[in-house]
Amino acid sequence: MRFSGKIAVVTGAASGIGRATALRFAEEGATVLAADIDAVAGQELADRSNGRIRFQRTDVTREEEIVALLGKAEALGGPDILFNNAGAGGLRAKIDEIDGDGWNRTMDLLLKSVALGIRHAAPLMARKGGGAIVNTASVAALAAGAAPTAYSVAKAGVLHLTKLAAADLAKSNIRVNAVLPGFIMTNIFSSAVGLEGAAKAQADALIRGVGQQAQPIRRPGRPEDIAAAVAFLASDDASFITGTHILVDGGLSVGPRHSWDPDTPGLFEALASLAPAA
């Protein structure tokens, strides 16, 4: 198995892409240290893994918790792999509507946490002779209008950070790459606007419809689609690949795009309209 004897750290592991990737690493032989702010879902993942996955509640916006997480990975004999994946929809405002606090929260979660994960994992990996880091960016890093402003800017930052870190860390035999998901069936959209129950089901149907219209491959992606790309980039099969990214978007970035009419809401606004009135 590709990851036998490896210690893989996965943030945002309690659901969606992170959960699928933690399971993929475990299935291929790794010992996985799963991190998430959701302690209930994270521990449930670990409890069902036959000991292959261990969970540590982690708020990646707090540097000391990132340090503690990687310290636990070191105690296990790692880290060999770091998947910086924790995230959420973030501030939904347009550029002329943003506020400083919301902007900072989005950057802390989506960009600063990735930088700090790399910063604190790199010395540990270097002492082991190398490692692999994969960061979750987004197709929104490449085009305006694909997602809210702050989210898109943060993900563009992750993409450039990936390149800079790859150049800096190659001397330590540490590879750094990114995955750029397109429309993936996770809770990130509905959670961003606080949807539950019937409204969440409606939101899932809306996202599925957008995915079918927006991409040459006429379906939204699955978390497992991203996990497969992450596993490849983290493996020795990608030993000569660093400083780049893989688009996992069903052709969204190259094919005919779904575009909202300027007089109708964007995706997040459409989802927000499903939420019950306060």
Place the predicted regions along the sequence by residue.
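Substrate-binding pocket helix/loop in short-chain dehydrogenase/reductase
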Residues: A93-I95, D99-N104, G211
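Short C-terminal tail/terminal secondary-structure segment
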Residues: R92, A231, T242-A278
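Short, flexible catalytic-loop segment of classical short-chain dehydrogenase/reductase
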Residues: L180-L195, V254
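Residue(s) in the substrate-gating loop at a strand-loop-helix junction
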Residues: S138
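Alpha-helical segment proximal to the catalytic Tyr-Lys
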Residues: P123, A167-K171, S239
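Active-site helix of classical SDR
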Residues: I118, A154, T162
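C-terminal substrate-recognition "lid" of short-chain dehydrogenase/reductases
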Residues: R2, I118, R219-V248, S253
